[in-house]
From Swiss-Prot:
Signal peptide: none
Bilayer topology term: Single-pass type II membrane protein
Assigned keywords, A-Z: Cell inner membrane, Cell membrane, Copper, Membrane, Signal-anchor, Transmembrane, Transmembrane helix
Stated role: Exerts its effect at some terminal stage of cytochrome c oxidase synthesis, probably by being involved in the insertion of the copper B into subunit I.
GO MF: copper ion binding
Biological process terms in GO annotation: respiratory chain complex IV assembly
GO cellular component, one term: plasma membrane
Periplasmic side: 32-188
Protein name: Cytochrome c oxidase assembly protein CtaG
Keyword check for Transmembrane helix: yes
HAMAP family xref list: CtaG
Cytoplasmic face of the membrane: 1-8
Length: 188
């Protein structure tokens, strides 16, 4: 092989590596955009401006609430209400209660899902605590609000006619903990 061939091969491999790294960083935002647009996997819509729906539907829907905690996170996490009955377009405020059961300050973060998945695109969150780091001091208990509504178009979609119950499920995961004695962050 000539020096020119080796140089071309090296540049090609370097370009391939750089492209793969860039694609790996771009894949999460691209996937999130895909899920928002299509409602894939129960991804909900998120209201970017606090504009409340003025038009209300007529078909009652039951919203059930679920809470899960990763085994590595010593928190108690429960919905304050097990379920509510609403109509599309009705703004609703519910709370989840979270308590740090450990002797250390801990930062956690949550993800959510709406089931059945096909209805996720009609579940509009106005405010929630998901995807934001939450610091709970040792023994601290907090209420975390979620404000949402079901888009009025839910009633018009023939695929939603059989749905009477939606479930909003949150799962909390440990990000890191801060040792009470040393004040240092301990990574998960």
């Amino acid at each position: 092989m000539s020096k020119k061939s080796n140089k071309n091969l090296a540049f090609s491999l370097l370009g391939l590596i750089i492209s793969m790294v860039l694609l790996s960083f771009a894949s999460v935002p691209i996937y999130n955009l895909f899920c928002k647009v299509t409602g894939y996997g129960g991804t909900t819509a998120k209201e970017t401006v606090s504009v409340y729906s003025k038009v209300k539907g007529t078909k009652p829907i039951i919203i059930e609430f679920d809470a899960n905690v990763d085994k590595d996170l010593p928190w108690r996490f429960i919905p304050r209400q097990q379920r509510v009955q609403i109509v599309p377009g009705q703004n609703t405020l519910v709370f989840y209660e979270t308590e740090n059961l450990s002797d250390n300050d801990i930062i956690g973060t949550s993800v959510y899902n709406v089931t059945p998945n096909k209805a996720g695109k009609y579940f509009v969150k106005i405010h929630c605590f998901c995807f934001e780091e939450q610091l709970l001091k040792a023994g601290e208990r907090v209420l975390m609000p979620v404000t949402f509504y079901i888009d009025k178009d839910f009633e018009l979609d023939p695929e939603m006619q059989d749905i009477k119950v939606l479930t909003l499920s949150y799962s909390f995961f440990k990000v890191r903990e801060m040792s009470s004695l040393r004040g240092n962050y301990v990574s998960n």
